[in-house]
């Protein structure tokens, strides 16, 4: 027995973890479990079985219950299966986040904006989860916690890449945004549609580079016009292209830099408006 709501059982010689409200209340070892009380059943992998057991025995029940509610809500909203390890990773993360909040310690996530744009459905669930946690536990979580939860959900989706791949994409996009801000000395208005178009374009560029696919091609005449007409934007894009070449060990062609420059030029009015708002 792990706690009143979770217990380890064996079926056909295979160890399983079953969960349900009060499923183990008043039970002793080897007592039968009522099938009608089982809400969830897991067959933990060899790698996470002991972690799962430890978390279920050491984490406050209200955290476990919240984690399971979030996972169930996410499964319904996203209509996708999750890897079983989400029950370990998310529960452990929430316990840590709540502990920090209770100690009034704030850990900021500098990638939160990129996560919001990249993983919108998961981020929306993260926002819902933050409100649920705050309401249930009477704590105040940092705004970025929605992004942290979103990343856990995204990486637990069985059809998606692992945490390392997702984090690399988020980190690269965050770095590219910061390069533009440093180059022009102004802050990007990330909620604008023009920035979203640039963000989406760069996300596709990174995906094509990762998959070894051909990037955009641009007519030489148009490329020459972009260099002349949008010289500053092209210089910024060229700097970003050189950085990506080093980071990804793949040359970014000049034509792709031209497309990046066009997107950068389109977001420059948003840069100026954002800077104006900050100076008021």
Task: Please provide the spans of the model-predicted regions.
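A cross-family "folded-core" feature that marks the main globular domain of proteins
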Residues: 1-280
């Amino acid at each position: 027995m792990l706690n009143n709501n979770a217990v380890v059982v064996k079926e056909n010689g295979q160890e399983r973890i079953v969960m349900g409200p009060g499923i183990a209340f008043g039970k002793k070892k080897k007592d039968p479990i009522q099938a009608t009380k089982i809400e969830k059943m897991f067959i933990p992998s060899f790698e996470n079985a002991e972690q799962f057991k430890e978390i279920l025995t050491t984490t406050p029940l209200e955290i476990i219950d919240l984690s399971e509610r979030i996972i169930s809500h996410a499964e319904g909203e996203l209509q996708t299966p999750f890897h079983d390890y989400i029950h370990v990773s998310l529960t452990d993360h929430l316990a840590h986040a709540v502990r920090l909040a209770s100690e009034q310690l704030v850990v900021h996530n500098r990638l939160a904006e990129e996560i919001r744009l990249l993983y919108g459905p998961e981020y929306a669930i993260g926002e819902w989860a933050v409100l649920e946690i705050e309401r249930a536990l009477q704590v105040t979580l940092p705004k970025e916690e929605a992004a942290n939860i979103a990343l856990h959900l995204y990486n637990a989706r069985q059809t998606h890449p692992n945490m390392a791949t997702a984090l690399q994409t988020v980190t690269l996009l965050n770095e590219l945004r910061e390069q533009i801000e440093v180059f022009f000395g102004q802050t990007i208005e990330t909620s604008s549609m023009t920035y979203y178009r640039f963000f989406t374009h760069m996300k596709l560029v990174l995906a094509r580079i990762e998959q070894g696919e051909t990037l955009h091609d641009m007519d030489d005449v148009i490329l020459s016009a972009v260099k002349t007409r949008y010289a500053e934007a092209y210089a910024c894009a060229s700097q970003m292209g050189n950085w990506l070449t080093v980071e990804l060990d793949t040359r970014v062609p000049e034509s792709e830099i031209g497309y990046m420059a066009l997107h950068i030029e389109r977001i420059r009015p948003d840069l100026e408006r954002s800077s104006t708002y900050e100076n008021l």
